[in-house]
Amino acid sequence: MNSYSLLTRSFHESSKPLFNLASTLLKASKRTQLRNELIKQGPKRPTSAYFLYLQDHRSQFVKENPTLRPAEISKIAGEKWQNLEADIKEKYISERKKLYSEYQKAKKEFDEKLPPKKPAGPFIKYANEVRSQVFAQHPDKSQLDLMKIIGDKWQSLDQSIKDKYIQEYKKAIQEYNARYPLN
């Protein structure tokens, strides 16, 4: 039995708003999980130049030193990498640069196909708008203290201004849900 059925069975009919909240939370969680799963399937960052070298020469190092543990073989490989001639090392570095540029291109294409993140909530939108102003007024404060100041400003903000941010968020989230429905 899934968590949604447990939630719906455990409350009475008078708790309809709670059902909607539970449903919304589960959908948001599912949407985030789906996005994270898609991201995991994306292109992987290429390995370093040293690991390219290690892949090419590991079997040779194992043949030369069959009794050594893998950590000791890696240590030998690291020492040989450090003492490697510049032109040979450059071959691996340029190969890594080539792989990295291919990765960046594939990553950009992949990221364009991902659904965007959910719109920021009302407080986050407000915080983003006033952050630079608050930081300029209090340059000696830590990030945590500055965020507390922004939180206090939000709490003391006139409700009509808060409602403006809330309405903008509701509109943005409706557009987001319409454009990227959760099946």
UniProtKB/Swiss-Prot annotation:
Disruption phenotype: Has a temperature-sensitive growth defect in glucose-rich medium, with slower growth and smaller colonies at 37 degrees Celsius but not 30 degrees Celsius; the phenotype is suppressed by overexpression of YHM2. Keywords: DNA-binding, Mitochondrion, Nucleus, Repeat, Transit peptide. Its main location: mitochondrion. Pfam families: HMG_box. It is found in: Mitochondrion; Nucleus. Residues 43-111, 116-183 bind DNA. The keyword DNA-binding applies. One of its GO terms (biological process) is mitochondrion inheritance. Residues 1-26 form a transit peptide. Gene3D superfamilies: High mobility group box domain. GO terms for molecular function: DNA binding; DNA binding, bending. GO terms for cellular component: mitochondrial chromosome; mitochondrial nucleoid; mitochondrion; nucleus. Specific binding to the autonomously replicating sequence 1 (ARS1). Interaction with regulatory regions: probably involved in compacting the mitochondrial genome. It might play a positive role in gene expression and replication. Present with 3810 molecules/cell in log phase SD medium. This is ARS-binding factor 2, mitochondrial. It comes from Saccharomyces cerevisiae (strain ATCC 204508 / S288c) (Baker's yeast).
